[in-house]
C-alpha cells in the first residue's frame, strides 16, 4: 500500500469515527442527551464542539487542572472533523456558555444514583454508611463573581476572594458522592443539608459533625423515609431527660424543642426521643446522639467506633482539592454560571474516578476501593480517556477490561506502625543565619 492510500484510509476512518462511541463506556451518551433535553439545552445548528462532548471537556478540566481548556479538547479529540486540526480557545469558552450548569448538574445527579445503586456496598446492621460535611471553594475575583457570591467577612474585613459554600453526601466505604448542594456564604450548612434530605435513600445511617445539630433538621431527616438514621455529637450544654437505661453509657433520652424550631419545621413536635451514648476515646469522654433507638438491633458497643468513620469524607475532600485539583485553591471560571458548571464537573470527575476504582477493587481479593491509590487511579483514568480516542471500536472492550484489571498497580501498602515518636523539626532557611548570641544575665 502506498503512503497516500494509507493516509487517505486513516483520514476516512477519523471522519467516520464518533467520539461518543469510544467514551460511551464511561458515561452513557443517551443519559447525557437526556440530561441536555431535560435542562432545555438544545441547539439546532451543527457545531464542531457538540454539547454532548462538552460534558467530557468539563470532566477533563477537573482531571487536568494545569492544562488550558483548548488543550484538553485537543488531547481528548472530542471535536468533530473540520478544516482545522485544532480548536480555538474562544470556541471552547463559547461552547461552555452554551452548555450551562444545569445539564452538568443533572448528569452528576443521575450518574451518582446509577453508580451508587450498582455498587454492592458493605452494610452495618443493614444500613449503608453515609456522611455529610461542608467545604468552601474560592472563585476568581471578578465583578460578576463578586456580585453572585458575597465574600465572607472576618472582624468586619471582607475576604480576598468570593467563595462558594458546598455540602456533599458521601458513601464512606467507596467514597462515592451521592448528593451535593451549594450556595453562597450567606447560606448556612444546615440550609444546604436540608436540600439533601430527599436525595437520601432508605436504610441508611448518616454521620454528621456537631455543626449540623438541629432537632428540626434531624427529625425531618428521620421522617423522610424508612430507616433513615443519623448520628451526631451532643451539643455542649444541651438539656435532656433520661427515659430509661439501655446499658452502660447507653440511655434513651427525651429532648425538648424550642418554639422557633417548631415554627420553622411544621412536623416537629414538642419533644424528640433519641439515644444517647457515652464513649471514651483517647481519654476524652464523648456524647453521641442517634436516632437508632432499637437496642436489640443496633448494639451500643459498636456504635461508638462507628462514628470514627465520618473522617472518610474529610479524606475525600482532600483527594478532590489536593490530588485532583493539584492544590490550586482558586477555580478557573470567571462567571457565576461557569463556576457552578465547573463545580458540578469536579464532582462528576471525582465520582468517575471512584467508580473505576470500585471496578478495579472487584478484581482484588480482600481489598476495598478506599485501599487503592486515588492519585494513581486519577492519572490512569485520564490516560485511558486519551487512549480510547485513537483505538478502533473493536479494541475498546479489551482496553476497558485491562483498566479494570490494573488494580494491582494502584494497591496501597499496609500502613506501618510508627517506630519513633513524632518530632517537629525546625523549618529550613533559604540563607544561612548567624547563631544568636547568648544574652547576659543582669
Swiss-Prot record:
One of its GO terms (biological process) is DNA transposition. Keywords: DNA recombination, DNA-binding, Transposable element, Transposition. Belongs to the transposase 11 family. GO terms for molecular function: DNA binding; transposase activity. InterPro entries: RNaseH-like_sf, Transpos_IS4, Transposase_11, Transposases_IS4_N. NCBIfam families: transpos_IS4_1. The lineage of its organism: Bacteria, Pseudomonadati, Pseudomonadota, Gammaproteobacteria, Enterobacterales. The gene is insG. It comes from the Bacteria. This is Transposase InsG for insertion sequence element IS4. Involved in the transposition of the insertion sequence IS4. The keyword Protease does not apply.
